[in-house]
Amino acid sequence: MSVSPVSIVSTPVAVSASPAGAPDQPVQPVTVRWRGREAYEASFDAMRAFTDTRTADTGDEIWVVEHPPVYTLGQAGDPAHLLVADSGVPLVKVDRGGQITYHGPGQIVVYLLLDLRRRKLMVRALVTKIEEAVIETLAAYNLASVRKAGAPGIYVASGVHEGAKIAALGLKIRNGCSYHGLSLNVKMDLRPFLAINPCGYAGLETVDMASLEVAADWNDVAHTLVGRLIANLDGASAAADKPHALEQSND
């Protein structure tokens, strides 16, 4: 997978009006950074540093990456959910919510570095917007998917793989700002999921778009997903999908 580094800027919009009726200041545009294939630890360190050093004036960013094979275990995760100790895939303990998951080639990983206070956005509302973006993205490829109460992520709605997980979600909120994010399986080697209880659920089937007979290009799906995320987050049109919305970046 090869991705040219670009920065996509969404349209700034006012999120609400003040009690006196005067419009609030518009939310700053979201910058989208395409980081290509990157070691998990490098992304993890970078998003923590970004969050630790951001100020009230720092713009929000979305990072899109693809990782080499790695298991990540959430802050309160149980190591017992890694069923095969000598799988050859490294395990990294991280500070997001949730249990254990797998990242690898052929999977889109999106990190959301957002100032929730500035956006006047509660965590539950953010999760809903992310899940809606994934559902809308899959629908663009004629795949029906759903949420599950109490189990963040997105699941296949019907058919032979009904109930299988196709996208995972895990966030960390620090000082009113989010990092970590979501992963969507496009076309990947799914065998490493057999060595874990995905997200802490024993026997949970994990699939990708290819398993559902959709031959989708990683870049195309990633651009669709980013467009839906931006549209859901700030109310802008999904201009992020369109070539005129792309600007070259030095990232």
UniProtKB/Swiss-Prot annotation:
Source taxon at top rank: Bacteria
Example GO biological process: protein modification process
InterPro entries membership: aa-tRNA-synth_II/BPL/LPL, BPL_LPL_catalytic, Octanoyltransferase, Octanoyltransferase_CS
EC number of this enzyme: 2.3.1.181
Pathway: Protein modification; protein lipoylation via endogenous pathway; protein N(6)-(lipoyl)lysine from octanoyl-[acyl-carrier-protein]: step 1/2
Keywords: Acyltransferase, Cytoplasm, Transferase
A single GO molecular function term of this UniProt record: lipoyl(octanoyl) transferase activity
Annotated site residues (Lowers pKa of active site Cys) in this chain: 165
Enzyme class: transferase
Entry annotation: catalytic residues: 199 (acyl-thioester intermediate)
Domain (BPL/LPL catalytic): residue spans on this chain: 56-241
GO cellular component, as recorded: cytoplasm
Record field: catalytic activity: octanoyl-[ACP] + L-lysyl-[protein] = N(6)-octanoyl-L-lysyl-[protein] + holo-[ACP] + H(+)
Chain sites annotated for binding substrate: 96-103, 168-170, 181-183
Residues annotated as signal peptide: none
Pfam families: LplA-B_cat
HAMAP family membership: LipB
Family: Belongs to the LipB family.
Protein name: Octanoyltransferase
